């Protein structure tokens, strides 16, 4: 009991390894403990593969140190109680003889929410919610913010990334913007964010001017779905997004809001928007932005204003991250957060 936080923290770290690779499922981690020692651990790696609890049980069996019988399993999300593409996790827990389950976050899926505790209790397994460190609970909840949004609304969790100068400009008078963010901030918000999201969205002008690949070098299999917003549909046929041979599809839509909703129907759980102010504004003004990540560089551009600002007051919780010579603000829309 006293070490619950220690083992739950390990489960959270394991869960993070699955971010961006489990759609439409959530990223979940699990740790099995017996006699105060970890005897098995695992995380959900991809949809259709073992859930975290099953992966941890199999890991314990392979290690052969101790049987899971009578052990405690720590899970970042309430175990599922109904079979899907794989069996229900509560059945695997019961079959392994695990006697105690500690989970961090209730499953937001109405099909499973609250049902694990009742089912496990009938089998003589104690199931309880983790009551420790509030910061740790927030980390566990943040792991499933995209899943929560998608499973309750059918709409992906949308993150908008913008880079700007101290005077609020995202490019100079000639449209140059690549040099605003530092190398450190590009690594943080580029490769890292692309790796943990299911899809990346940009506008047609980004494709025409920058010809980006929009892939993540650190992403396994490069299965990031690329989305281009173009009202006219006129895009260069030789653009990298169409010719680089990546296994994932490049999708073209004429409207950003429509694209987000269609992506949700396709099972896309999270979308990273790397377009400019116009694309960000089109999503914000219809209430589709969940998270803003703004890179603020220590430069003053002094360019002419570029279009109107985003209308409406943003209702956000804000934090700041130092990143090389720049700093990054991370803003979460409060709606829908527990």
Show which residues each predicted segment covers:
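Hydrophobic packing residues within well-ordered alpha-helices of enzyme cores
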Residues: 93, 140, 144-147, 210, ...
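The conserved SAM/SAH-binding core of class I Rossmann-like methyltransferase domains
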Residues: 29, 104, 229
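Zn2+-dependent cytidine deaminase-like catalytic core
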Residues: 32-139, 282-284
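N-terminal glycine-rich anion-binding loops that anchor highly charged ligand groups
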Residues: 22-36
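Short, compositionally biased "basic patch" segments
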Residues: 30-31, 51-56, 60, 154-164, ...
